[in-house]
């Protein structure tokens, strides 16, 4: 490719995504991610997202783990919150109806096998209702609050794999559901923020991973699976740092950021991280912080085609972390926000266009009974109700 050309830049992004995912990615989905990505960034910028820019108004780009060049755009270290602020304002300004405190607990199909809506549960009143729809988009996020292998998580309380349960029970296929991303730098001290994300941007601006012997034992911007396994290895082999309460982790040498970038770099580039630690009297400009891997991202999910549609259930679309195949078995930094915007925006457009041609038949929940019959035939018993709308942290039910 012509170095510096638009296609060369996208080709390199494609190769980075494929390599980072151990070439288990679905090529068609990766192509869509990198081809539609620049237009989506421009769309967000036009909507008012306050991306980091230099004095001339050009967007600042940074490296992430496993990337061959700087390409990641950010809004300080709270890009997700800034994008959500902008999109929320857009929803309000356009008077788009939103049903709050209400979760989908079952998809509805018609006799032709098409998705036909969902059963909704009002989590305040306990009342059920039916939403009839010609197209449905599942965008329910991840599963970190399942706490696989007993790990802490950076995820919100609703990250309990609800969308995967809904889709699977209705007949949608799952892809790479065994693959979960452990972010290498989750907070392990203080305990009040156990599992909270220490963003990769901390390492992209200069912080090093250091073991108890003072050794920078690994490149800080390896892919996340490599860095996470490296942290665990150091702790398992006796080179971890003791943490109050009996846990172990490694140091993230944050003072190195200001040595490399100059005084004020931390407050300028990663202000949210600085505030989070200062809330507990820890000045990351002066002392390193202690970290350990945290459950962060669901690499697998529901199977979709290049247009975002389920390949098994007509008129069902999936976007964001609930979809599988885009990131293979390991996601690169920055690609989750890009993914949810590229495929979320696409899903909205495709759903709106498709519903004009859909004719629904009689609605039913036959697939739920069929699924229950399969469980009984297999002798599977469970004491949990799914989807699990909130994690089970109580010792016993009231």
Regions inferred by a protein language model and the residue ranges of each:
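Alpha-helix capping and helix-loop boundary segments enriched in small/acidic/polar residues
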Residues: 5, 28, 75-78, 124, ...
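Glycine-rich loop(s) and the adjacent beta-strand/alpha-helix scaffold that form part
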Residues: 135-192, 196, 334-350
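A glycine-rich dinucleotide-binding beta-alpha-beta segment and adjacent secondary-structure elements
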Residues: 105-121, 269-323
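Single conserved hydrophobic/aromatic residue that forms the stacking wall/gate
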Residues: 1-9
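Rossmann-like flavin
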Residues: 20-60
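Glycine- and aromatic-enriched mobile tails/lids
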Residues: 5, 43, 49-70, 110, ...
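Conserved redox-cofactor binding core of oxidoreductases
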Residues: 45-127, 132, 139, 147, ...
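An anion/pyrophosphate-binding glycine-rich loop and adjacent beta-alpha core
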Residues: 166, 172-283, 350-357
